[in-house]
């Protein structure tokens, strides 16, 4: 899909409440596609016996992967949990590791979990009306800790690419789970 003239100026609609765009290409991720990414795979299987919930979707414009352009779009991460672990995006490094990304939270609340190849981790809150800068060299994953969809606008260098494979093997070193006191970041048991 490439409906836009990327060597010219154009405008595109994005609904600021729900992140949808009539002109963007939508990709949906269901629990069945992500069940191995949650630490409690038994809880995931139990949910899948009843339904296959939509965990998140993103809307992008099909920007060519070339230097100098900016890819942008929206992510809608729905509320929910697998066991005690909150719904999350798959997360990724960029193929060009030295690429940063910016997320602007349009609605909802959550957390961005980040880690670099050396194992350093950080977590930052995602709050409506705030922009979050994800530094270069950091894999990043959004987590919805609220009761409503977490809606974010994102942008990054179009030639950066996505590396999902590195994360798919063991997941992130840290995960976000519900405790009596609220959302808590813990070590991922899969890294033990």
What does each model-found stretch correspond to?
Residues 20-125, 145-150, 155-192:
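Active-site region of the double-stranded beta-helix
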Residues 111, 131-132, 136-141, 161:
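Histidine-centered metal-chelating micro-motifs
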Residues 128:
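Trp-centered recognition loops
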